[in-house]
A protein has these predicted regions:
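Extended substrate/RNA-proximal surfaces in nucleic-acid metabolism proteins
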Residues: 1-106
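Charged catalytic cores and adjacent phosphate/nucleic-acid-binding surfaces used
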Residues: 32, 84-168
Length: 168
């Protein structure tokens, strides 16, 4: 997995050219120097403002970068969000999410279904089903399953459930 940022396009491309990985998951973790998992990212922002900022950054990264095969945990922003209702309602961000998905389809990129949502209380993989279905409606064909494992015990965590989720 490679964290994508708008100011490292050249470096990311060079890194993947000189290190011929079999497969690269691109993702957005840091925006304007602040990690989305940190409280500071959300400080002073409404949920709508924070989530829009996140999705706009994902769109920018998806468009600028070519060094990835699939985009990972597309609705990750809600994992650490401090809001009482931290869910991502696809309809609230439809325009920008659709632009992200269209960009992936046009570039021949895929979407990674990430099972970490089961470990972190979402009760489902990332992205949510509405986003996955919309990706398919827009012509998306490449879907992978990943566990975002940071420990050996989490490798392939709930892949069976994720497989059924993708088939639904």
């Amino acid at each position: 997995e490679m964290g994508l940022q708008k100011h490292i396009v050249r470096e990311a491309d060079m890194f993947t050219q000189y290190n011929p990985f079999d497969f690269v998951i691109g993702s957005t973790h840091v925006i304007d120097g602040v990690d989305v998992s940190q409280k500071e990212f959300f400080d002073g922002l409404s949920k709508k403002e924070a989530y829009t900022k996140y999705f706009e950054s994902v769109l920018e990264n998806a468009m600028l970068h070519n060094c990835y095969n699939v985009y990972g945990h597309l609705d990750y922003v809600n994992r650490h969000a401090p809001y009482e209702d931290n869910s991502v309602n696809y309809e609230d961000y439809r325009d920008v999410i659709d632009e992200i998905l269209k960009t992936l389809v046009e570039k021949g990129k895929g979407l990674d279904v990430n099972t970490s949502g089961y470990r972190y209380g979402a009760g489902r993989p990332y992205p949510q089903m509405d986003i996955l279905k919309r990706f398919r409606e827009l012509g998306g064909e490449i879907i992978t399953i990943g566990s975002d494992a940071h420990r050996p015990d989490d490798i392939a965590y709930r892949f069976g459930d994720a497989y059924e989720y993708v088939k639904a």
